[in-house]
Regions:
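Helix-loop boundary and gating motifs at the non-cytosolic
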Residues: 1-20, 25-28, 199-211, 223
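Helix-breaking motifs and short loop linkers at transmembrane-helix boundaries and internal kinks
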Residues: 21, 53, 74-79, 246
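Juxtamembrane intracellular "pre-TM" segments in multi-pass secondary transporters
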Residues: 164-194
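C-terminal membrane-cytosol helix-exit motif in multi-pass small-molecule transporters
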Residues: 151-170
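Cytoplasmic helix-loop-helix junction between adjacent transmembrane helices
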Residues: 84-121
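Short hydrophobic/alpha-helical segments at membrane-entry points of transmembrane helices
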Residues: 79-85, 190
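Residue-level signature of mid-helix packing/kink "hotspots" within the transmembrane helices
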Residues: 35-43, 127-128, 231-232, 236
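Conserved MFS/SLC helix-loop-helix module at the cytosolic interface between two early adjacent transmembrane helices
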Residues: 40-76
Length: 249
């Protein structure tokens, strides 16, 4: 899922500017529509995960998310691309929350730090390697090839969900619908800290390839190679440090 998504993140701005002639301000609107869709769904995702069977919900959201990649083949204006990204962002929010919850459920509690470290590693690897693959595909075959490859990868990801041995959960009463189910006040400081880190990172990842082409860097993909090396090293070390009490969270 993440690999498919991050293939579009650095290459879509280049496609919009070079092939559709869209201004950089409009590019920002297109990119932000995805985040807006995600934010509209995220507050309700936890409630849905608690109310319904998690694995079927995960498969449903993942399937819609994957199929929406095909929408980019037909979206040729700013507003149609924004619409596809908005809807896909919403299903990305539901897919990520249900996937994270399932991951926590299946990891043994004694190895949760290490397990989540490896889970996070796969996400970070996708963030680092998918743009590298996408840049190579874009230079050789164009943006529509990226869409096709991303769609296939996402569909393979759906198939791999069947390999997850998810324990049966006892039926519990559905939680009452209330505002505090969607906003966890205690989590706001951590959310703010992550937001302050994610904003500059998202800006960098979205426009680094476009900037590299503007200053005529021969291969902007090297940026992602070095980032992948650092991410893998940090993730492999940090999970074990948390489990052994060396890092307190």
């Amino acid at each position: 899922m993440n690999f498919a998504f991050y293939m579009l993140m650095p290459t879509m701005p280049v496609y919009l500017v070079e092939e559709l002639g869209i201004s950089t301000s409009e590019v920002g609107m297109v990119l932000s529509s995805y985040t807006i869709g995600l934010l509209c769904v995220r507050p309700f995702s936890g409630y849905l995960v608690d109310c319904f069977s998690r694995k079927p919900l995960y498969v449903f959201a993942f399937t819609i998310f994957a199929c929406l990649f095909a929408g980019y083949w037909f979206a040729m204006t700013v507003y149609t691309i924004m619409a596809v990204r908005f809807i896909q962002g919403g299903f990305m929010g539901l897919t990520s929350v249900s996937g994270n919850t399932i991951t926590i459920d299946v990891i043994p509690s004694k190895r949760r730090g290490e397990g989540m470290g490896f889970y996070g590693l796969t996400i970070n690897l996708a963030m680092s390697l998918a743009p590298l693959v996408a840049v190579g595909l874009y230079d050789r075959h164009g943006f529509f090839w990226i869409i096709g490859v991303a769609l296939v990868i996402a569909l393979v990801g759906i198939g791999s969900v069947g390999l997850i041995r998810y324990p049966k959960r006892e039926k519990v009463p559905r939680p009452a619908f209330s505002l505090d189910r969607f906003i966890l006040v205690k989590a706001l400081p951590a959310a703010l800290a992550y937001l302050l880190v994610a904003i500059p990172y998202g800006m960098l990842l979205s426009f680094v390839v476009l900037y590299g082409k503007e200053i005529e860097v021969p291969d902007p993909g090297y940026f992602f190679i070095f980032m992948a090396i650092v991410v893998v090293t940090a993730r492999l070390i940090s999970g074990r440090l948390v489990d052994h009490g060396k890092i307190h969270v």
